[in-house]
């Protein structure tokens, strides 16, 4: 039984913000912002990476049902290539907070830096394993992106995206060198860029 984080730590109108998908070679970076309702506990919240896929899927539905407000946002591959991954992630986090139906009094951002926001914000290193609202955001972002990568695997078969979700595994790198990049591969990432830079013999 996974106990998860103490729901008593939930504060009124504090948004947790997290991202998933900074490291993959393809697909969007996905962010989420969540304001939890202190009167509607969600048991078992934790860093999405520490939960089984089945548990994440169940919590995904429960968070969306019980949270005071939530928003899932993204930055597309084109934006990642144009802005760089850090700036694209900050933009996607900004979109998630701005998309909330309730304005938070504070946004707690997983990591060590904050996007430009109209509300006060603070970074929390390893926030997804400390702050329930950030843990909830990590679950929404991960489940959303994982589902999308399964769909993209059907559109671009042969790369194994449903399995590795775009991360640079041996299977992915081998397929990339054999099949070449797809339109959803990030041209600014070295393994993809190097393939495109190879001169034709």
Swiss-Prot record:
Q: Does the keyword Lipid metabolism apply?
A: no
- Taxonomy, superkingdom: Bacteria
**Gene Ontology molecular function terms on file:** manganese ion binding; RNA binding; RNA-DNA hybrid ribonuclease activity
Which key words tag this protein in UniProt?
Answer: Cytoplasm, Endonuclease, Hydrolase, Manganese, Metal-binding, Nuclease
EC number from the UniProt entry: 3.1.26.4
Note the Pfam families from the entry.
RNase_HII
UniProt function note: Endonuclease that specifically degrades the RNA of RNA-DNA hybrids.
Family from the record: Belongs to the RNase HII family.
Report what the protein is called: Ribonuclease HII
**Provenance organism:** Pseudomonas aeruginosa (strain UCBPP-PA14)
């Amino acid at each position: 039984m996974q106990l998860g984080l103490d729901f008593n730590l939930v504060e009124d109108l504090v948004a947790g913000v997290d991202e998933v998908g900074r490291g993959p070679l393809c697909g969007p970076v996905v962010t989420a912002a969540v304001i939890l309702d202190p009167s509607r506990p969600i048991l078992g919240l934790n860093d999405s990476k520490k939960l089984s896929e089945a548990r994440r899927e169940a919590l995904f539905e429960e968070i969306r049902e019980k949270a005071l407000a939530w928003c899932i946002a993204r930055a597309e591959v084109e934006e990642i290539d144009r802005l760089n991954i850090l700036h694209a992630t900050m933009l996607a986090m900004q979109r998630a907070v701005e998309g909330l139906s309730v304005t938070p009094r504070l946004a707690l951002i997983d990591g060590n830096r904050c996007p430009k926001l109209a509300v006060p914000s603070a970074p929390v290193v390893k926030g997804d394993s400390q702050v329930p609202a950030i843990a909830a955001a990590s679950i929404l972002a991960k489940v959303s992106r994982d589902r999308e990568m399964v769909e993209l695997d059907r559109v671009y078969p042969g790369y194994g995206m449903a399995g590795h979700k775009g991360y640079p595994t041996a299977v992915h790198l081998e397929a990339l060198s054999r099949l070449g990049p797809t339109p959803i591969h990030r041209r600014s990432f070295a393994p993809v860029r190097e393939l495109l830079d190879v001169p034709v013999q």
